[in-house]
């Protein structure tokens, strides 16, 4: 299993994880990152090219998969970013509270055990009014698609490092104490609907007066 996890899975993610519709959304939301950035689940490093090096001082990367880290380091060398890969000892993020300007998560919250507690930990390291940028997939709004998601979830969990396609990501983000201030959603081609319903947007750790929701075309 370690061979698949570290030698096969990272290349599978690199091959499948960034088709044009997804890449275009990365290009839109990741330049919003600024200051000290914490990215959870760096994957193969496809986000690096979308950070603005004139706005981002440093990127801390949490990635438990050594195979992913090797691919991400190849991408890091192509940028002008200052990047530090950090370990996750236990469940405690090894950064001081209130020190991070931006937290980034792309296609990671579906895999984390105890995801609400993990999100609370991310909220703690954010500075007051720091920003959480997310781009995730999960539970579709259509009942017929949800049925297929529940049937397919065991396969997703096996093939994609514990991926849960039945998670309601906005609800989990809110449960952790974040306030979503911008969100868009929709099915993203070319993947089947059982795995392609996504949300992308931003949230803050303190309550805001309002939020706006935009429905993307399906």
Place the predicted regions along the sequence by residue:
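A short glycine-rich, Lys/Arg-flanked "PGG" loop and its adjoining helix->strand segment in the class I
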Residues: 116-128
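Core SAM-dependent methyltransferase catalytic element
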Residues: 178, 185-218
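A short acidic, Gly/Pro-enriched loop at the edge of an enzyme's catalytic core
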Residues: 88-103
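Class I SAM-dependent methyltransferase SAM/SAH-binding core
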Residues: 38-40, 44-92
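A short SAM/SAH-binding and catalytic strip from SAM-dependent methyltransferases
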Residues: 101-115
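Conserved alpha-helix/loop element of class I SAM-dependent methyltransferases that forms part
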Residues: 16-36, 46-50
């Amino acid at each position: 299993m370690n061979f698949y996890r570290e030698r096969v899975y990272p290349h599978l993610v690199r091959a499948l994880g960034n088709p044009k519709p997804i890449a275009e959304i990365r290009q839109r939301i990741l330049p919003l990152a600024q200051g000290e950035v914490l990215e959870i689940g760096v994957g193969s490093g496809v986000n690096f090219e979308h950070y603005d090096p004139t706005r981002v001082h440093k990127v801390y990367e949490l990635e438990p998969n050594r195979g992913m880290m090797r691919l991400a380091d190849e991408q890091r060398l192509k940028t002008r970013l200052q990047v530090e890969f950090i370990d996750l000892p236990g469940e405690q993020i090894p950064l001081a509270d209130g020190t991070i300007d931006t937290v980034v998560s792309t296609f990671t919250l579906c895999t984390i055990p105890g995801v609400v507690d993990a999100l609370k930990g991310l909220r703690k390291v954010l500075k007051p009014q720091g920003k959480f940028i997310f781009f995730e997939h999960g539970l579709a709004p259509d009942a017929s698609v949800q049925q297929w998601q529940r049937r397919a979830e065991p396969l997703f969990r096996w093939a994609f490092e514990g991926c849960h396609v039945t998670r309601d990501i906005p609800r989990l983000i809110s449960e952790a104490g974040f306030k979503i201030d911008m969100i868009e959603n929709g099915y993203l081609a070319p993947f089947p609907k059982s795995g392609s319903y996504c949300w992308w947007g931003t949230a803050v750790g303190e309550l805001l007066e309002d939020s706006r929701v935009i429905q993307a075309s399906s």
